[in-house]
A protein has these predicted regions:
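N-terminal glycine-/serine-/threonine-rich phosphate-binding loop
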Residues: 1-50, 59-69, 78, 183-186
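Conserved mixed alpha/beta catalytic, RNA-binding, or beta-rich assembly cores of soluble enzyme
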Residues: 18-20, 175, 190-246
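A glycine- and small-aliphatic-rich helix-loop capping segment at beta-alpha/alpha-beta transitions
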Residues: 26-31, 63-74, 128-136, 206-213
Length: 256
């Protein structure tokens, strides 16, 4: 079904690595990207921004884990809360950069971030095989030290680049906040949603949503988002030069 807007509706997925490794670097990259994003609006499009958070959420989670072990006044935060934090601060930088560019171009559009929950199947086989890398890169000795400190944490080697924390990556089923996203799109908002693939949730026996420690693949999430909002286009932006299969392996093949 086609959405009712006369404008082209575009979902843009920004890779977490494309946003930099520190808040300062991230803000600088967002400010550079903001002009191109706002230009899409000026050309007769409406946009929804999704973004990765692999480096960011991993660093947030690890920081709280280490701090809580050093100081009992620091609470531990599980992955759903850390994902929400990353959605907040990445969304803040995106909002600020885009709002500044909207003002410069004298455009009356609004911009807002929605903390987004994503429904997943509690029986998804991914929960038995955590393979989604998040956070920074470590040598093997450091990674094994982290696992010795906390047996619930799993680290694995990531395509020859180092060791990273591995978490389950279930497939997205639905967006809890989809009505809010569509309503804002229909009212001249640039919407920032589904940050980091969204906060994975399952429904309990009462029908309430419960967060779970997992990360949804950002590209799968963006595709589901594009489907739900009936987007005309889906753009996936990343820090790598081209699309490849068997990436980082001897039989790597570049597709584009």
């Amino acid at each position: 079904m086609k959405h009712e807007s006369s404008l082209n509706r575009i979902v843009i997925a920004l890779g977490g690595n494309a946003l930099g490794n520190t808040p300062k670097e991230q803000e600088e990259k967002v400010n550079v990207a903001a002009e191109s994003l706002v230009n899409l609006i000026a050309q007769g499009n409406e946009i929804i921004l999704a973004h990765g958070n692999g480096p960011q959420v991993g660093m947030i989670n690890l920081a709280f884990d280490l701090a809580s072990k050093q100081n009992n006044k620091v609470a531990e935060f599980d992955l759903p809360e850390c994902t929400a934090m990353s959605q907040g601060y990445i969304g803040y930088h995106l909002q600020k950069g885009i709002k500044k560019e909207l003002k410069r171009q004298e455009m009356p559009w609004h911009v807002a971030t929605i903390v987004t929950q994503i429904l997943v199947d509690k029986d998804d086989p991914a929960f038995k095989n955590p393979q989604k890398p998040i956070g920074g890169y470590y040598d093997e000795a450091t990674a094994r030290e982290f696992m010795e400190r906390d047996p619930h944490i799993v680290f694995g080697e990531d395509a020859g680049r180092g060791w990273r924390r591995m978490v389950p990556s279930p497939r997205p089923v639905d967006i809890v906040e989809k009505d809010s996203i569509i309503n804002m799109l229909d009212n001249a908002f640039i919407v920032i949603a589904w940050g980091g693939g969204g906060i994975p949730v399952i429904q309990d026996e009462k029908g309430d949503y419960q967060g779970i420690p997992a990360v949804i693949d950002k590209d799968l999430a963006a595709a589901k988002l594009a489907e739900i909002v009936e987007a005309d286009y889906l753009f996936i932006l990343t820090a790598v030069d081209r699309v490849s299969i068997n990436w980082g392996m001897p039989n790597q093949q570049d597709l584009a």
